[in-house]
Amino acid sequence: MAELQPLALQLEQLLNPRPREADPEADPEEATRARVIDRFDEGEEEEDDLPVSSIRKLAPVSLLDTDKRYSGKTTSRKAWKEDHWDQTLPSSSDNEIPDEGGSEAGDSEGLEELSEDVEEDLEDNEIPDEGGSEDGDSEGLEEEISEDVEEDLEGEDEEDREEDRNSEDDGVVMAFSGVKVSEEVEKGRAVKNQIALWDQLLEGRIKLQKALLTTNQLPQPDVFPVFKDKGGPEFASALKNSHKALKALLRSLVDLQEELLFQYPDTRYLVKGTKPNAESEEISSEDDELVGEKKKQRKAPPKRKLEMEDYPSFMAKRSADFTVYRNRTLQKWHDKTKLASGKLGKGFGAFERSILTQIDHILMDKERLLRRTQTKRSAYRVLGKPEPVPEPVAETLPGEPESLPQVPANAHLKDLDEEIFDDDDFYHQLLRELIERKTSSLDPNDQVAMGRQWLAIQKLRSKIRKKVDRKASKGRKLRFHVLSKLLSFMAPIDHTAMNDEARTELYRSLFGQLNRLDADHGQ
């Protein structure tokens, strides 16, 4: 009997009259044809749903339907979490054990309740065997349960102790971090004040440089009596006023130095006149408090009244006493910078000399240092000395090139004068560092200043490293000279070194005319 085809398959065959290719592996018999079934029964008994018993039908109605107190309400996840945490936090605090007595009482009550429950369970589940075994089992169960409860309580106590320790550790960490932050803030303020103080001292040094240049122009001892005789009372009054002003300036500078030395505990011995402490190190907080109390008692160093003749010896003694603190401070910061930079013991670092050895080595050649301070580096004229006469320039004829007089190199550095003090090289170095520091902290929005700084950096880079074209050697690159554009009727400027005859020979050799000329000359 032919199988009835579904309607969809019949319609598809009508719409597509092309005959379908038969599958050679398909089974024409319906009984033996492979087919897919929903479930294969292997003989297992199906567990049908059991009907509800009559006892369940007689059960009371749910409390949710009868009592409104047990009815629920819609809520959001966020509100549920907040209510959940609000409920769990007080419950955890209620479980805390106030003291040891209360904990022991609670443990005993919990053990009694558990033992009663175990006895009831044993009475309900009695086994009709030996009576002694029942008693032994119940006692063993009671002991095991009591041990488990004690272990649980001990574990809770340990967890509470760990939480307390963690909270204490968090407090210590927070306090430690707060102390660290406050220390860093204080260090930053100290560095800022130190930079401001350095800028003020440098500003005073710049103002004193003008006075130094004026002092170098004053008459020297060999001609000073002549100026004094010819100057008269006007010169004497001006000399007296300048002497008073100079004395007041020296007194102010000495007071400023003593005030700065007295404020710092490590240099206070210089003002008091006591011996320095060789084992002086960084001051602790307790020492700072003592120093603050002493400062309140004595806020200023003692005033000194010195005459002009006493200042040279006083400053020499002060400089010698300051050497101990200077050497100790230089060595300390030199070691710190070496450790911070990581250059200690690497390469030739073991052969490096200490900073104090280098300073002593430089100070050994005192004659050279004195000559550097007695060298006239600026253009000024000392009163009482004749002006330097420039060398006459030889006259040149109209057709001859102009010849300049030959001046030896560094001639201005050979102008020595023992009566002057000139440190323009050190002064210019200070100015250069000041300008670099000021320009490094420019406003990024100031495009003009940033452009100037960028040009200065580019100049320094071009001096440090020059661009070299390594491919231009051995004739691998064509060399040429760019001529400037001609303006209006301007004649071209010939920059080549070849003359007309050389050009003629070049062109003749290129086009083969040179050989013909040689042949004509030979005939």
Curated annotation (Swiss-Prot):
GO biological process, one term: negative regulation of apoptotic process
Family: Belongs to the AATF family.
Sequence segments annotated as region (Binds RB1 and SP1): 336-435
Protein's recorded name: Protein AATF
Renumbered residue ranges of the record's region Binds POLR2J: 237-279
Renumbered residue ranges of the record's region Binds to TSG101: 447-523
Region span, Disordered: 13-172, 273-305
Organism: Rattus norvegicus
One Gene Ontology cellular component annotation held by this UniProt entry: nucleus
InterPro entries to which the protein is assigned, alphabetical: AATF (IPR025160), AATF/Bfr2 (IPR039223), AATF_C (IPR012617)
Compositionally biased tracts (Basic and acidic residues): 30-40
